[in-house]
Amino acid sequence: MAFALLRPVGAHVLYSDVRLLSEDEENRSESDASDQSFGCCEGLETTRRGPGPGGGRRASSGAGPVVVVRQRQAANARERDRTQSVNTAFTALRTLIPTEPVDRKLSKIETLRLASSYIAHLANVLMLGDAADDGQPCFRAAGGGKSAVPAADGRQPRSICTFCLSNQRKGGSRRDLGGSCLKVRGVAPLRGPRR
């Protein structure tokens, strides 16, 4: 006698009255899939496994097609809200990052990379203080300028950022641009007491 190993066919294809599986149920491992009953051989399933934990067929929640549709619609609405929230946050972040040209539309990955670089740049500006009057603290601190500027407290500045590198490639300085990146958004640099 020959036996064939058959994989379960989706319930929604064979039986329209069986509820659709949620994402969690669809993502279960194949061993868990063997525990599911798709409407055929229900009596055989319970006698073979017997009652008890993990045995027998799963109790149906009594969810009809209308309930499943409502649950799916609610999940879709939550996902739309989440996506809208993420997009709003990216829009807010884009307004804080100086770009050239000013109206340049950044992708999400460009926004994250530029934000990271801008944070590093601002950290170097804070670390170096007044020592970087040319508007390129990261470039000078990395040794790319005429003299490397050490941090006031001996810490090493971070590597050159996109903003200082762009400024250096243009051959410009702080005075040529009419102010540092801090002044692009109307933020004045912090000036602490000189040591």
UniProtKB/Swiss-Prot annotation:
Region called Disordered, residue ranges: 26-65
Protein name, per record: Transcription factor 15
Gene Ontology terms describing biological process: ear development; establishment of epithelial cell apical/basal polarity; mesenchymal to epithelial transition; muscle organ morphogenesis; negative regulation of hematopoietic stem cell differentiation; neuromuscular process controlling posture; paraxial mesoderm development; positive regulation of stem cell differentiation
Main location: nucleus
Cited function: Early transcription factor that plays a key role in somitogenesis, paraxial mesoderm development and regulation of stem cell pluripotency. Essential for the mesenchymal to epithelial transition associated with somite formation. Required for somite morphogenesis, thereby regulating patterning of the axial skeleton and skeletal muscles. Required for proper localization of somite epithelium markers during the mesenchymal to epithelial transition. Also plays a key role in regulation of stem cell pluripotency.
UniProt keyword Membrane, yes or no: no
Gene: TCF15
Subunit details: Heterodimer; efficient DNA binding requires dimerization with another bHLH protein, such as TCF3/E12. Interacts with MEOX2.
Residues covered by the bHLH domain: 70-122
Keywords: Activator, Developmental protein, Differentiation, DNA-binding, Nucleus, Phosphoprotein, Transcription, Transcription regulation
Positions of modified residues (Phosphoserine): 60
Species in which this protein is naturally found: Mesocricetus auratus (Golden hamster)
CDD domains in alphabetical order: bHLH_TS_TCF15_paraxis
